[in-house]
């Protein structure tokens, strides 16, 4: 992916997320450092019960996991938890594979 293009695509995510170190929590957690911290570790953010259950199963925010999550957050949580009713606050999906790759490349620079 192209991190510069990803920064542009991620602007649409800025409604719910911040991207700078120490950035405010919004509807979604601050994504600064997401690839270097464990799931559910954004300071001060109240994660959904389904997200907490998935995080308890253990995973890392590597490129493949981010790809699965931003493709369909609800399906990701259902698969991780084994609960078809699992839901998250994030319902936005990035449909285009190239945009997902670009956003993932951008997120990897935030550390």
Curated annotation (Swiss-Prot):
GO molecular function: electron transfer activity; heme binding; metal ion binding
Transmembrane segments annotated in the record for this chain: none
InterPro entries: Cyt_c-like_dom (IPR009056), Cyt_c-like_dom_sf (IPR036909), Cyt_c_1A/1B (IPR002327)
Chain positions recorded as heme c binding sites: 13, 16-17, 90
UniProt entry keywords in alphabetical sequence: Electron transport, Heme, Iron, Metal-binding, Transport
Taxonomic superkingdom: Bacteria
Family matches, as Pfam families: Cytochrom_C
PTM entry text: Binds 1 heme c group covalently per subunit.
Protein name: Cytochrome c-550
